[in-house]
Amino acid sequence: MTESKSKEELAQARLDARAAKDFAKADQLRDEIAALGFEVIDIAGGFEFRAKERFPRYASTRDIKAIKVDGDIAITIIVDGFITDAIDAVRTIKANTKTPIIALVIGEPAELVDEIDLQFQIVAITENFGWGENTNALLKNLSTKYMLIMDPSTRFLGDAIAPVLTELDKGEFSAVGWRGGLVNTDDEWRSVDDKGAGEVDVLFGYFMAFNCADATNAGGFNNRAIYYRNADMEFSLRLRNVNGRLLQMDLPLEQGRHHGYYDTKEEFREVQSKKNYDRILERFRGKSAILSPRR
């Protein structure tokens, strides 16, 4: 679809495709019209349009229905305010890959709605149920083999999906990401050391892709994790606890201002981060057998 094509032009092309019995093309054109916010209705001698919701809206993550996505992998972003950053992130993705994108938006999507097309869709919820539960809702309702969760502050500088998909398809790693590290066992698991590309103990949610079946087998993300910080580490160790391996890669990405950290109230940030990390220490500290080889 090009920007110059109106819904009328697309609808006529759909009629022509149906007449030629090219039903796959007709379905694609129907979806393009839907992305513009309309349902096309066949009538005698032509067509008419009915306005439709451009995205679903739910009261709870438990109400979210299956998210239709083509392909083996989908990029997911949780958007809680800072819409301009989310728009920038979506545009850099579109400029570098055709991979489907789903934004789980808390509250009103505002101008982000203007980015909806065949590649990008929005799922909105009226209340924030926390990072862990929001991410699990995406994991549960996506039909893809792999899911990628990224922060709105992450920007694509090139195609970061192709190399990730190549590694995941090998089946050696349950998760692949951009930033991560090895748990520092010398300080009682209280820090993580970035050792660069290679096998790691934990990956961070700036950009992390994983096998959905492996993630589900590990128990997914912790619904008690209201805040993102350290929840990604907890998920990583859950994967390693069921023999999942994690790979950190050098990828064409950069990070802008991380609003989830810098623009969150300090007391909330520190309290929730500590709660997440305390769970890590309680469950995993001392279980060195689940860690990756030291390097």
Enumerate the predicted regions with their spans.
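Donor nucleotide-sugar recognition loop
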Residues: 216-240, 244-248, 252-254
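Conserved donor NDP-sugar-binding/catalytic core segment of glycosyltransferases
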Residues: 155-189
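Short, acidic, metal-binding catalytic loop of nucleotide-sugar glycosyltransferases
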Residues: 91-100
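Active-site donor/metal-binding and catalytic loop motifs
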Residues: 45-47, 248-268
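N-proximal low-complexity "stem/linker" segments adjacent to membrane-targeting elements
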Residues: 53-91
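Glycine-rich, basic loop-to-helix element that forms the pyrophosphate-binding segment
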Residues: 125-142
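A recurrent flexible, glycine/aromatic-enriched loop bordering the glycosyltransferase active site
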Residues: 191-213
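Short aromatic/hydrophobic "clamp" motif used to bind/position activated sugar donors
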Residues: 147
